[in-house]
């Protein structure tokens, strides 16, 4: 299934960049892979983001084979997943257990932190209203998103910028299980809750649940994994 160059515009990811050059975000890959599902809710397993695509005009192809989906750019595979039934059950790891706030950032501070480690977002993806980190390594994110890709990306942004004070840039590299109630429409307001399940200097992992204002579960990301990348801060590196 050919994906037209307008795909990036439709997902609202024009201008999304890491280290100064545009790149299709992890949430964009999840949405592209979800488009192949015929049932709702959508269940994706073992999603892997293998290679970044930095050319918004690059021809992408979505291929399906016995429950496996892949997005390809030319001869290279960029993202893969398996399909599975979706139950949208509550993730125990995302249940709030602590009320002691260690850190809190409003929208302006959050995006300054992102920019300080080379993470810049188009207007559609500037959807984080507030981020709170708690003493038990859990977090919450208030989200106002116009697209499903932005909705999914909001809590990922919070984790990517977690270590901004040390100048560390993290990017998503995979999700063990992603479930979406509706892959086509995003609620106007949502709250993401999550918890770090692993953290080292080189990698992070977490579970995330997204709910509407009335508490309806709309998406879960279980086993989201992040890797630290080479210094992407503005002006970093030789001659920077």
Predicted regions, residues:
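Acyl-thioester-processing domains in fatty-acid/polyketide/NRPS systems
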Residues: 1-240
């Amino acid at each position: 299934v050919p994906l037209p160059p307008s795909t990036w515009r439709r997902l609202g990811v024009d201008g999304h960049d890491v280290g100064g050059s545009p790149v299709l975000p992890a949430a964009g890959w999840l949405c592209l892979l979800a488009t192949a599902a015929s049932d709702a809710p959508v269940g994706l397993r073992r999603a892997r983001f293998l290679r970044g695509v930095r050319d918004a005009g690059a021809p992408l192809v979505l291929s399906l084979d016995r429950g496996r989906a892949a997005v390809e750019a030319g001869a290279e595979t960029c993202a893969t997943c398996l399909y599975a039934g979706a139950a949208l059950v509550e993730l125990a790891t995302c249940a709030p257990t602590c009320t002691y706030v260690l850190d809190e950032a409003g929208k302006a501070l959050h995006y300054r932190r992102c920019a300080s480690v080379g993470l810049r977002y188009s207007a559609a993806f500037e959807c984080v209203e507030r981020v709170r980190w708690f003493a038990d390594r859990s977090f919450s994110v208030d989200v106002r998103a116009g697209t499903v890709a932005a909705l999914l990306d909001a809590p990922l942004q919070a984790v990517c910028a977690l270590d901004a004070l040390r100048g560390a840039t993290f990017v998503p590299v995979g999700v063990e299980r992603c479930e979406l109630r509706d892959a086509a429409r995003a609620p106007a307001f949502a709250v993401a809750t999550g918890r770090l399940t692993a953290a080292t200097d080189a990698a992070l992992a977490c579970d995330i649940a997204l709910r509407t204002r009335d508490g309806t579960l709309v998406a879960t990301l279980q086993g989201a994994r992040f890797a630290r990348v080479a210094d992407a801060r503005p002006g970093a590196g030789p001659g920077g």
